[in-house]
């Protein structure tokens, strides 16, 4: 869940995808068009499904849809010994999604985000930082996009040039366990994918690390067009 947030409005997360397997919910993702979902590479798993149109895990929406992955794409130049390297996965669904009251895609960004931007985080992950407590509904919060140097200092061994740093130096609001793969939305644009953070979520001075979606737009578009040999930025 999201630390320091509140229940999302039921109409603000039509693009948010819930990943689940036999053990239950485990990650989030973002619907970018009727056939494709973007999530974190570290969310890859066997025998998972994706639910769209979900708000409460206990109260069904009449337009919820479930899909299986048909194809999964991870950067061919990813260093598999480093979990957070190129932490992005593109998934083709087994059949297209129909737009509905609670389901609609979110477009890829048209420009990179700016430091200082107010960004929205959301997910069904833990709402408590230490002993995990998972809510039935997604929580949302606003955080700030910070300068790279903040996360380079906080996570010297995890920082990548293709990542974003977002949160608050004093802590308080953050993504947490179960939010991985979900979106970071800055000024209305899909700019980041939840990747990594401090093991005690929401604790300063370590904000969250997000994969920078803008850096991967060319790779995403090439794969959707059928060029599966496309490589990701270094």
Swiss-Prot record:
EC number: 3.4.21.-
Disulphide linkage map: 8-140, 27-43, 75-232, 119-186, 151-165, 176-201
Entry-linked CDD domains: Tryp_SPc
Residues with glycosylation annotation: 21
GO biological process entries: proteolysis
SMART domains: Tryp_SPc (SM00020)
Active-site residues, Swiss-Prot/TrEMBL: 42, 87, 180
Protein localization: Secreted
Tagged with keyword Glycoprotein: yes
Top-level taxon of origin: Eukaryota
Positions of the pro-segment in this chain: 1
Further comment: Negative results: does not have phospholipase, fibrinolytic and hemorrhagic activities.
Protein purpose: Thrombin-like snake venom serine protease. Has arginyl esterase and fibrinogen clotting activities.
Similarity-based family: Belongs to the peptidase S1 family. Snake venom subfamily.
Protein name: Thrombin-like enzyme acutin
């Amino acid at each position: 869940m999201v630390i320091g947030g509140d229940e999302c409005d039921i109409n603000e997360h039509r693009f948010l995808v819930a990943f689940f397997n036999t053990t239950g919910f485990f990650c989030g993702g973002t619907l970018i068009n009727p056939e494709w979902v973007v999530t974190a590479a570290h969310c890859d798993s066997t025998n998972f499904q994706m639910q769209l149109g979900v708000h409460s895990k206990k109260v069904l929406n009449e337009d919820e849809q479930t899909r299986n992955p048909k194809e999964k794409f991870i950067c061919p130049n990813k260093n598999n010994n480093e979990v957070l390297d190129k932490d992005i996965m593109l998934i083709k669904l087994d059949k297209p999604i129909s737009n509905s009251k609670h389901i609609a895609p979110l477009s890829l960004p048209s420009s990179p985000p700016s430091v200082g931007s107010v960004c929205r985080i959301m997910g069904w992950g833990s709402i408590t930082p230490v002993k995990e407590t998972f809510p039935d509904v997604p929580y949302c919060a606003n955080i700030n996009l910070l300068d790279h140097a903040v996360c380079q200092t906080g996570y010297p061994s995890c920082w990548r040039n293709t990542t974003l740093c977002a949160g608050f130096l004093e802590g308080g609001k953050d993504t947490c366990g179960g939010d991985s793969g979900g979106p970071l939305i800055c000024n209305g644009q899909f700019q980041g994918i939840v990747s990594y953070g401090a093991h005690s979520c929401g604790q300063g001075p370590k904000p969250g690390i997000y994969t920078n979606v803008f850096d991967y737009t060319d790779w995403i578009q090439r794969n959707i067009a059928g060029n599966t040999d496309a490589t990701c930025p270094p």
